[in-house]
C-alpha cells in the first residue's frame, strides 16, 4: 500500500493551526478546504499527460494536458464535505459521488445510510475525502461500495490518520493509496485519534457543544 504523509511546510503549518482547540469554525473550515487542495495536488501527481497542439499567440504550440483521466471525488458525509470545495478548485471537472456512513459509537462499525455514485465508475479514478482516518471501518466500507460499482483506482485523502486505521485498510485493500497531512500516535478507547483534531465534522459545521 502506498501511504504518503505530506511533509510540505504549508501542509504542516496548516494542520498545526487546526489542532488549536480554540480555533474558530470559520478558520477551521477554511483550513480544511485549503488542505483539501494541497493534499489533492499530491494525490494527483501521477496523472498521465499527453501532448496537445493549440494555436499560441506566436503560432501553433504543443503543450501538455491530462491524458483522458476521469475522476470522481467522494466526500464521506458529513465531514468530507468540508474538504470538497478545495479539491474541486483544483479539479473543477470532476464528478462528485456522495457516501453517508455513520459510526456506531458502541461497536465502532460503520452504518451506511446514503449512497449516490456517479455513472461509469469503471472509467474513473476515485478520490475519497474524509478529515479523519480513525479505525478504518468507514473507509473500508466506502472502498467496498466503490469497487462493487467498478471504480478502477481509489485513493483516500485525509487531514489526520491513525496507524490502526491505516493497518486495517491495508489488510483488506492493499491497492488503495492514502494521502494525509499527519499520521498521529494512536486511537483512544472510544476510537478517536490522539492527538487528533477533535470532532472534525462538528468543528467544520459549527455544531460542537460549548
Swiss-Prot record:
Lineage, uppermost ranks: Bacteria, Pseudomonadati, Pseudomonadota, Gammaproteobacteria, Lysobacterales
Residues that, per the record, bind uracil: 193, 198-200
Catalytic activity: UMP + diphosphate = 5-phospho-alpha-D-ribose 1-diphosphate + uracil
Cofactor note: Binds 1 Mg(2+) ion per subunit. The magnesium is bound as Mg-PRPP.
Residues annotated as binding 5-phospho-alpha-D-ribose 1-diphosphate: 78, 103, 130-138, 199
Signal sequence region: none
Cofactor: Mg(2+)
Main function: Catalyzes the conversion of uracil and 5-phospho-alpha-D-ribose 1-diphosphate (PRPP) to UMP and diphosphate.
Cited Pfam families: UPRTase
Free-text activity regulation comment from the record: Allosterically activated by GTP.
Keywords, ordered alphabetically: Allosteric enzyme, Glycosyltransferase, GTP-binding, Magnesium, Nucleotide-binding, Transferase
Organism of derivation: Stenotrophomonas maltophilia (strain R551-3)
Enzyme Commission identifier(s): 2.4.2.9
Similarity-based family: Belongs to the UPRTase family.
One GO biological process term: UMP salvage
Alphabetized InterPro entries for the sequence: PRibTrfase_dom, PRTase-like, Upp_B, UPRTase/APRTase, Ura_phspho_trans
SUPFAM superfamilies noted in UniProt: PRTase-like
UniProt key word GTP-binding: yes
Listed GO MF terms: GTP binding; magnesium ion binding; uracil phosphoribosyltransferase activity
Keyword Acetylation: no
Protein name: Uracil phosphoribosyltransferase
